[in-house]
UniProtKB/Swiss-Prot annotation:
Pfam families (alphabetical): MukE
Subunit field text: Interacts, and probably forms a ternary complex, with MukF and MukB. The complex formation is stimulated by calcium or magnesium.
Protein name per its UniProtKB record: Chromosome partition protein MukE
Family: Belongs to the MukE family.
Keyword check for Repeat: no
GO biological process: cell division; chromosome condensation; chromosome segregation; DNA replication
Positions of the UniProt region annotated as Disordered: 203-232
Stretches assigned to coiled coil: none
Encoding gene (name): mukE
Amino acid sequence: MSDNLAKAISNPLFPALDSMLRAGRHISTEDLDNHALLSDFELELSSFYQRYNTELVKAPEGFFYLRPRSTSLIGRSVLSELDMLVGKVLCFLYLSPERLAHEGIFTNQELYDELLALADEKKLMKLVTNRATGSDLDKEKLFEKVRTSLRRLRRLGMIINIGETGKFSISEAVFRFGADVRVGDDIREAQLRLIRDGEAVVHTKEPSQGSLLSEEDQEEQAQEEMTEEGEA
């Protein structure tokens, strides 16, 4: 073990940071201390995670995350279609002028309204149930599912909750859901096409669409959903 690697893993921040990365969290520049640790020891920690057949990735936007290979010793699961669609709409909002106008802060309702405005409503309703007709009850169920998706994406470091008011800011990590853009193309228009063409609701096992949610996180989510249903 190199001196630098020993220094990295002996850092008091490392145990919690390692757990977050293994659970699928993206470490963005907003997380100053953890991001600095990864930046300072990127080479050494990349070698460390290779032992688990997992790649420590630094995205062009500056955030870090783990990408397990098929033979990885670190498990991963795939996000739902709605999770991915919400992620793509979050990316669209991140690129929008509204983000500056709102000082980077959005509400759950604003995200939901944007989702309804940008995506095919019939496809959205099918994510609630195949028998959905677009009734007020179906829309309420969709809103609850969107809130669940936002909680999952928060665990992955895509959004940052602001208090308990249903408000959040969007991390640059949402570019995991960004459209591939050629030089000279309008990235926001490309993202809009990605949403409207229906690509955002196609289930895929591409690494760029994969979550790294641990089994523990999935169990916690299931318990949350059951609690919400009980309260309803």
